[in-house]
Structure formats: C-alpha cells, structure tokens
Amino acid sequence: QSVWHKPPQTVRCAFLYNRSPQDSGWSYWHELGRKALEDTFGSRVETVCCECVAQEDAQEVIERFIEDGYDVIFAASPVFLDACIRQCAIHPNAKILNCSLLASYHNVRSYYLRVYEAKFVLGAIAAALSESDEIGYIADYPIYGTPTSINAFALGAQMVNPRAQIVLEWSTLPGHSPEAALAARDVHIISSRDISAPHLESRAFGLYHEQDGVIANLAMPIWNWGKLYEGIVRSILTGAWSDEGEHNADRAMNYYMGMSTDAIDIICSQRLPARTRRLVDLLHERIRAGAFLPFVGPIVDQAGQVHVAADVALTPQEIILMDYLAGNVIGRIPSVDELNDVAKGLVSLQGIRAATKE
C-alpha cells in the first residue's frame, strides 16, 4: 500500500542554546544561522530560540516545543544529546536534531560542519607567516572533532614548512594560561577559538600574531550554520526529509557539510601578503571542488605509528573518530580529571578515548 507524504507549506523551527549568543561565540554562530533561515524563507519559516538551557533542563524544554507544535527542533550543543535521545524515544515521529559528531542513534539526526577544511588552510597560512618553526594552537575540549582540527592545522602547516611544529595548549585546564605558556616558548603565531563572544573585547581568536600584548588578526574560519539549516528545512518543505528517513531506515542520519556547500569558509586579513593570499584562494578552491583532500597519507602520529598509508584518503567516519595527534604536534591530550568543571561535563559525553580512558 502506497503512503503519500504531503510536504508542509510552512515549517516552525525551535532552537536550544546552552549559552547566550552574547556570551558564547558558539551560540552566536548558531543564532546567525537561525536568522539566515528567516531571511531565506520569509513567511514559510517561523523560528524561536531558548537560550541558556541547562543540560538537565533540556528534555523539558524539548517537550514544551513539541507540545507547542514545532515541526523541527535543533539542539545546538553536544550537551543536549542525551535529552534528544530520550525525547525521540517518547516521540519517535518528532524531528529532533543534535549538533554533535557522534549521534549514531536512528531517531536522532546529528549535524556538524567540516571546520577541519578551514583549519588546514589556516595551518598553511601560519607556516607561511611564522618566522620560526613553532606555531601555537590553543584547543578547548578533548572531544571528537578536536584532534581532527588540530591535525588538519598541523598538516597544513607541514605542507608549507616541513619543519613546522605545532605547540598545543589547552584552555580548559584550571590555573593554566595557554597564552603565557606559548609566550614562554617565544611562539607568536597562534590559532585559538574561532570567534570571540560579541560582548568580549579580546581579539585573540582565529589565527593571529601576538607580540608584547599586541594582537594582529590574520584569518579565521566562518561557521555558516545557515547553509546547513537551510538545507535541512528545505528538505522538510519539499518532502525529502521523509524520503531520506525511509531510505536510511536502518542507520543513523548525519549532516556533515563543509566548503563544498559554503557552510565553511575563511576570512583573511588584508595584512596577508599577496602570494600567501593566492595560496589560500588555491587551497580553498581545490578543497571546495573536492579536488584536494586534507587527510591523505602518509599520516604519522607522535609515536611514529603510521595511521594512514601513502596516497590513502581517510573516510568521513575515520576523520570524525580521529583520536591521536599528528607527529609534528608538541603536546598531549589531557584526561577528563585534569579539566575544569565545565569541560568535564561535555567530555564525559563526547570525549575521545585518550581523554576518558581510566
């Protein structure tokens, strides 16, 4: 018996943020994506957001959105994964998506962006501009996706300078200043968080040069969540969402977009030399076209073990599950016990094996 799915004329979208867009660069990017939805679809889309949702309150908030008749719910943080799973068990027909890399559950679709593509290009820029072989990288949470970004940056730097070494520091260690640690090593080209919260005056984000407290921004990744949200909402409006679910009934659905869909981009400072800018444009163009893949072997870890053989390209799943550091990275992955309280909660859910193992 045939079952017909009539696409809706309008879509009501609800967003959950664990922090305010004014206080969190992460939530700010998602808020820009929500507003892009409204700009793109006009009266065909209605959106609402709930900010500063605590992890323990997320299930109740999702339940309220379902009761209020929202068609799709975007839980825009990995900390909401458990709440999404529980609500999907109660409401199997609800459209609930979690922004994470590891939501391998049939009823919960996950979504994320391939920021590693931009990190590879930023690594190349850093190596081109650094006067020394050491380049700084400040990471936050040792969760899946973080080693991917670190290694992409390291490989991009190594492509330009074979002697390049990435000095890895963590911002979530109590009582530790990654900036001071890098300054002590005389490291001045640094990759840090991708964006500063709107209310903060700090310019220490993206790729920057720091000398005697003076920061010069060089380049930064753009997380264009609007492109991803637009694609998902359009699939609902056209009826493709239901078709995707039927065709993938036995496996989890994940959305993982990058430069090819303009979901990831790069902004460069006018300070970049013309030749360096040409390199950036070339890499961006080739990655966007699928003609250049950042993760092609040989790739060796810090212990000298070959993880990827020569001329072999990693699959998306292998990229997501990466839990080692490339051979030209100086530093280590901290354990969950070493992290501050905020980081412990997220890492306990999505931490890589090196961080969560006993």
Predicted feature residues:
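A residue-level marker of the well-folded mature domains of exported/periplasmic proteins
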Residues: 2-358
